[in-house]
């Protein structure tokens, strides 16, 4: 079917998209290299979100292409149930070079959403193995994003992700860390560590003996880039420790460099009991995610009197530890190390912060937040037209040759780790011009 036939676009129900708007005005990407997409009109489009927080090392890296090509010729698929292949063990050992030393057992999934649901199941099953069968309740956070499977939307705190899908799993939510007194903060906000004490209220309400785990993003990304207030995560860690509650960090966005550290936990000086990852692990080139747990959690599952040929965790996916995804991820993590890209994020972050906050004072800009190479710009809503202005800004940026994400009332940036100073200035300039054009 010819692409200029309107029916060409009907068959694909696109995710997280205004399908009606897109199909009336398609924006097609045909190739990508380094920090740029190319659209079907031949225009170069700067990638201001690293794909979807995925491609920090840049697009079409030859090292990853070679690894994927070689792997698919050698072993295109291997069952992960009861059998193994070399690349999965190699990748697991590579991943724990990036995680805090106490996190050293890796369970593979195919996406961040699957990683989150896996982490929740592991947390609940852990307490059953410990004989504390009442510890089933899960605590998330308002404005938290933990993927789109039923576990993730249950602990997540973004209304539109939940309201159409009915009853999820048993969960409660901490207060958001977004406070009006912290507007236009640079890096971590100074006010708000006390918000961790909201967990004490949940403990009073439900009882610590009924709570399995708390799950938070070290830096909330998809809701609009909310770095944690100084001391907040350490306070949350202390409360969890005092009440025998597992702490899960959802690091699908923050792991592997985005914060200028190996993980978000490292950036903020806190080690969780369980950590999820995806996105940057493969540089977006192949679907792969996973969960990393502390050794004592893994050993609790292994400490059984059942015969050793029986399954310890009844969970997994057809494509868990897919050999091609593992090969891509090994190459991706090698690039981060060999090219010193995490150090480069540290170097470029102050430049990004300065340029991003230059937007303060523009009409409609009500807040700006940043950490590492992640930034969020809150735009005042037009009366009775929620999200209209961010959508208009994003489309104007696209027309100028820049891809930025709009979500709710926020323009989001997740710059490539290889971004240049001029590219930072250019993308912020495009946003500035696009905002001014609304006036």
Q: What is each model feature region?
A:
Residues 1-439:
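Conserved N-terminal phosphate-binding loop of PLP-dependent enzymes in the Aspartate aminotransferase
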């Amino acid at each position: 079917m010819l692409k200029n036939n309107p029916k060409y676009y009907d068959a694909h129900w696109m995710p997280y998209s205004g399908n009606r708007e897109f199909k009336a005005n398609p924006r097609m990407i045909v190739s990508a290299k380094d920090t740029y997409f190319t659209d079907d009109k031949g225009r170069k489009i700067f990638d201001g979100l690293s794909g979807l927080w995925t491609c920090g090392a840049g697009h079409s890296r030859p090292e990853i292409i070679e690894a994927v090509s070689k792997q698919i010729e050698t072993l295109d698929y291997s069952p992960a149930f009861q059998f193994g292949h070399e690349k999965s063990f190699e990748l697991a050992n590579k991943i724990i070079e990036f995680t805090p030393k106490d996190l050293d057992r890796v369970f593979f999934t195919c996406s961040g959403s699957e990683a989150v649901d896996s982490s929740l199941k592991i947390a609940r099953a852990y307490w059953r193995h410990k004989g504390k069968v009442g510890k089933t309740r899960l605590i998330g956070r308002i404005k938290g994003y933990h993927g789109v499977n039923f576990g993730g939307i249950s602990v997540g705190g973004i209304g539109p992700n939940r309201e159409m899908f009915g009853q999820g799993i048993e969960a409660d939510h901490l207060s958001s860390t977004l406070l009006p007194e912290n507007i236009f903060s640079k890096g971590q906000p100074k006010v708000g560590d006390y918000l961790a004490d909201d967990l004490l209220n949940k403990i009073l309400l439900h009882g610590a003996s009924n709570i399995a785990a708390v799950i938070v993003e070290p830096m909330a990304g998809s809701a609009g880039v909310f770095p944690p207030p100084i001391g907040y995560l350490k306070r949350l860690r202390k409360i969890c420790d005092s009440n025998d509650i597992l702490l899960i960090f959802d690091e699908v966005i923050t792991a592997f460099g985005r914060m200028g550290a190996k993980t978000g936990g490292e950036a903020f000086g806190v080690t969780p009991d369980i950590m999820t990852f995806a996105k940057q692990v493969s540089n977006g080139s192949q679907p792969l995610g996973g969960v990393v747990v502390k050794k004592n959690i893994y050993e609790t599952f292994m400490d059984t009197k059942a015969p050793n040929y029986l399954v310890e965790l009844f969970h997994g996916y057809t494509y868990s530890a897919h050999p091609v995804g593992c090969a891509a991820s090994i190459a991706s993590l090698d690039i981060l190390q060999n090219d010193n890209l995490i150090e480069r994020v540290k170097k470029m972050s102050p430049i990004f912060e300065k340029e991003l906050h230059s937007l303060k004072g523009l009409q409609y800009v009500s807040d700006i937040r940043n950490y590492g190479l992640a930034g969020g710009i809150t735009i005042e809503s037009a009366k009775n037209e929620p999200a209209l202005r961010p959508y208009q800004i994003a489309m104007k940026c696209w027309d100028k040759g820049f891809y930025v994400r709009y979500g709710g009332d926020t323009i989001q940036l997740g710059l490539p780790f290889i971004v240049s100073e001029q590219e930072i200035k250019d993308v912020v300039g495009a946003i500035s011009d696009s905002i001014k054009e609304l006036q």
